[in-house]
Curated annotation (Swiss-Prot):
Source taxonomy: Bacteria, Pseudomonadati, Bacteroidota, Bacteroidia, Bacteroidales
Family, as annotated: Belongs to the aromatic-ring hydroxylase family. TetX subfamily.
InterPro entries tied to this protein: FAD-bd, FAD/NAD-bd_sf, TetX_monooxygenase
UniProt organism field: Bacteroides fragilis
Name the record gives this protein: Flavin-dependent monooxygenase
GO biological processes: response to antibiotic
Residues engaged in binding FAD: D61, R117, D311
Complex formation: Monomer.
Further details from the record: Activity is not seen in B.fragilis, an anaerobic bacterium. Activity is seen when expressed in aerobically growing E.coli. Tetracycline antibiotics bind to the ribosomal acceptor site (A-site), preventing binding of the aminoacyl-tRNA to the A-site. The hydrophilic side of tetracycline makes many hydrogen-bonding interactions with oxygen atoms of the ribosome's phosphate backbone.
Gene it is expressed from: tetX
Keywords assigned: Antibiotic resistance, Cytoplasm, FAD, Flavoprotein, Monooxygenase, NADP, Nucleotide-binding, Oxidoreductase, Transposable element
Required co-factors: FAD
Domain notes: Consists of an N-terminal FAD-binding domain with a Rossman fold and a C-terminal substrate-binding domain.
Function: An FAD-requiring monooxygenase active on some tetracycline antibiotic derivatives, which leads to their inactivation. Hydroxylates carbon 11a of tetracycline and some analogs. Confers resistance to tetracycline via an oxidoreductase activity; NADPH is more active than NAD. Expression in E.coli leads to breakdown of tetracycline. Confers resistance to doxycycline, chlortetracycline, oxytetracycline and minocycline.
HAMAP family recorded: TetX_monooxygenase (MF_00845)
Amino acid sequence: MTMRIDTDKQMNLLSDKNVAIIGGGPVGLTMAKLLQQNGIDVSVYERDNDREARIFGGTLDLHKGSGQEAMKKAGLLQTYYDLALPMGVNIADKKGNILSTKNVKPENRFDNPEINRNDLRAILLNSLENDTVIWDRKLVMLEPGKKKWTLTFENKPSETADLVILANGGMSKVRKFVTDTEVEETGTFNIQADIHQPEINCPGFFQLCNGNRLMASHQGNLLFANPNNNGALHFGISFKTPDEWKNQTQVDFQNRNSVVDFLLKEFSDWDERYKELIHTTLSFVGLATRIFPLEKPWKSKRPLPITMIGDAAHLMPPFAGQGVNSGLVDALILSDNLADGKFNSIEEAVKNYEQQMFMYGKEAQEESTQNEIEMFKPDFTFQQLLNV
């Protein structure tokens, strides 16, 4: 009898309704997979042209107890393990000396192995029903009707949905129905780039990595590198945003030479292998570090069911590896709430998810922010952060 009541409650909550997920990143796609497992009608609207679009960025590591739990629930954990690579860390100084190495012990190889972003997307896409993801959809307007949302896309037909889940990243432009909070810059800046065939194009630095990720710091300049990102070496350089950049970035990221000149000046007394990395790079991406603070409660009155997951909900500095993992926990909790029959309405299920998310999301943001503060102190070393 109890089973019958639970099933009826679930059907009353979800039957004859459709869900629109905005954004086809790992969090949005995982959300779609978890909903489909429960027979929910879901569509993902993604601005990329197609599944072959290359995703820029470093590898992702899914943590035990958070990101991996969502993959397990989706039935994809072993596939993730098959494609992910356990990687150690080399910590170097500005002269290119290896100060310490933290290797992955065999018993820890599944703790948080690194996976290429496109590989993770492929795992998730291959698990979804055909035509779940609708490509080349840039959302320009979200409007509530009497019973459904209307989604308006740039130069594409409009769609409707009973529930909208925003998973379209930290710079989402359609949060107004959920909160008036705005994204804030934290005061640090990141420059990222890829070098293909690094063993040929920057052999000195590639050998310094020796198959591991590499981290180096000096006087507030931080360098992170991963030599194994599907044939490319991905690296990032982080520093406090210069005062003269407060109103406008003084480096033209459309002009490679402008970026190279700036970085060579910043790294003038670093080893030639670091300069080799800069000289070899063909293009750079510059990004201010941002946070979407969870300080104010979200709106309790919304015209129709809508919520946010992933960076759209809790963008944070990338200095604790918590972003994607927190987002996958979002997907796990929200999908359970919507499908397990515990709640009498979508609004109740969403509210409970948001209450939980605010707790672990704030904690993750605080950890990331504290790491950011510590890492940009002049005397910071990666040994103290990694306990090696």
